[in-house]
Amino acid sequence: MFCFVTPLRSPKLSDNWPRICALFERTATSVFRQTVGDFRHVVVCHEPPVLTRAFDRRLEFVVKDFPLPGKSSSAPRLAPAAWPIMSDDKVNKLVAGLQRAREQNADFVMLLDADDLVSCRLVAHVLSHPEADGWFVKRGWRYRYGRRWLETLDGFNHVSSSCNVLARRWFNFAGDVEREKSADAALILQGHGQAVDAFAARGVLLRPVPFRAVVYTENGENMSILMHEHLHGDRPQHRSNSLRRLAGHCKRTMSAWSKRRVCTSALRGEFALDLSIP
């Protein structure tokens, strides 16, 4: 059995809870579009999201009462002091989700953000290779809601945390709490871009998934984007030579255009991509 583990942000940490719910529902829809049904989706949250469609019992909400940071009364975004607690909240939820995956004796586990979309082919591919130590998504997609195209995203595992799959023998050590804590640290705390090397040091070979398996969505609620706003939003922009700036802009534009792919019906079907979400 394949288990997806998703940490869901509290409504108290969002400026737009209905949007968080809509984005998560699209993520869950992509999970439930798998071509094989041997999977579970464990979602750790403070409060279950409000959904417009019904899912069967393979979707499980694990409600936890982890401490929450406060919000500044003068700004819609979180106060600076909240960021460490917000990060800890996500880690705590991932650890709780991994523990639930162990209790369910999952053969493979994958951490999946609450707004990313997974290919309908992923579970079938992973379960057809029970001998594998695990997998990582080296190539994926990037999508910004409101657009009619996606962008190819190579080096996906360095951008999104929805990228690593681990076999049970490397995260489920019944009765050995310290080994399980070590596995959690390598999968969560080490950083998603460093997980391949971190597990290689333990003798674990994570293979690259041989197709673009996940869509990283940019939607204004990504933790990485919010953190960037917090760190760099008020930083003054240095002016550079106008010709050099223009050349750089042209180069970036050409590179971006070369990566674009139309959101075909096949891609929309594979990832349950809903272009109607603003």
Regions found by a protein language model. Name each.
Residues 106-117:
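Short beta-strand-to-loop acidic/aromatic patch adjacent to the donor-nucleotide binding site
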Residues 179-278:
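C-terminal catalytic/acceptor-binding lobe
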Residues 119-188:
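Conserved catalytic core of nucleotide-sugar-dependent glycosyltransferases
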Residues 49-106:
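Active-site-proximal specificity loops/subdomain of glycosyltransferases
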Residues 21-38:
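Short, acidic, metal-binding catalytic loop of nucleotide-sugar glycosyltransferases
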Residues 45-47:
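Acidic ATP/Mg2+-coordinating residue in the GHKL
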Residues 11-22, 82-86, 178-188:
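Short, flexible/disordered intra-domain loops and linkers
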Residues 1-6, 30-31, 39-43:
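Hydrophobic targeting segments
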